């Protein structure tokens, strides 16, 4: 069976030098997210022994800094760093999909959302809130989880689906892919007009 062993390789594209650099060859890293300083990658890893982990990798030399077992041995499918260096993980458990927050300084995990059977994807942090896409109401829309009140708010009301949220640099507009009968189009809304 080891004849078919394979790896996932952590790489990045250097725009200034116009080349691809391999950071960590022959690993089992998935779903990389880069910290605000561009020095550390948080990645998901499934070990040969079947443990699911969050791993912090030094992007300068590819060395593993630390690894942490995921609660309930959940599989992390997406990661994102917040402004406070805490990491949000969308994870698949035996009972569904959940949203975890991880604090690298303490090594503590916190479950932010109860496990659900609907898909959650494309997480981003903005102003202390987590924005993501989900089909919770039957159609994919953009949602926001506010840790201050532990509530989830639907922000868009797309007819066929809203995907891949992102904020403009000025922070005044939410951009997303709006699915239409003739394909995807880029849409945006002023932040103060969202369905909060």
Where in this protein do the model-derived segments appear?
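A flexible loop/linker signature enriched in serine peptidases of the S9 family
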Residues: 1-10, 24-29, 43-55, 69-75, ...
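Short loop/turn segments that connect beta-strands within beta-propeller blades
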Residues: 14-18, 58-62, 103-107, 146-150, ...
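A short beta-strand motif characteristic of beta-propeller blades
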Residues: 18-24, 63-69, 108-114, 151-156
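Residue-level detector of Asp-centered blade-edge/turn motifs that repeat once per structural unit
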Residues: 36-37, 82-84, 125-127, 169-170
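Strand-loop-strand
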Residues: 153, 157-160, 168, 173
């Amino acid at each position: 069976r080891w004849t078919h062993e394979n790896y996932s390789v952590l790489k990045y594209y250097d725009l200034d030098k116009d080349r691809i650099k391999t950071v960590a060859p022959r690993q089992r890293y998935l779903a990389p997210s880069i910290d605000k300083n561009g020095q550390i990658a948080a990645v998901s890893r499934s070990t040969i022994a079947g443990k699911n982990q969050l791993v912090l990798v030094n992007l300068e030399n590819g060395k593993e800094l630390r690894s942490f077992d995921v609660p309930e041995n959940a599989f992390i499918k997406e990661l994102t760093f917040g402004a406070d260096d805490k990491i949000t993980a969308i994870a698949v458990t035996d009972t569904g999909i959940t949203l975890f927050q991880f604090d690298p300084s303490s090594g503590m995990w916190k479950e932010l959302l109860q496990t659900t059977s609907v898909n959650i994807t494309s997480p981003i942090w903005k102003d202390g809130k987590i924005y993501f896409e989900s089909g919770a109401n039957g159609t994919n829309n953009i949602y926001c989880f506010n840790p201050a009140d532990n509530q989830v708010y639907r922000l868009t009301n797309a007819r066929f689906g809203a995907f891949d949220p992102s904020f403009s640099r000025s922070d005044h507009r939410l951009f997303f892919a709006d699915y239409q009968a003739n394909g995807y189009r880029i849409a945006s809304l002023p932040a103060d007009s969202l369905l909060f």
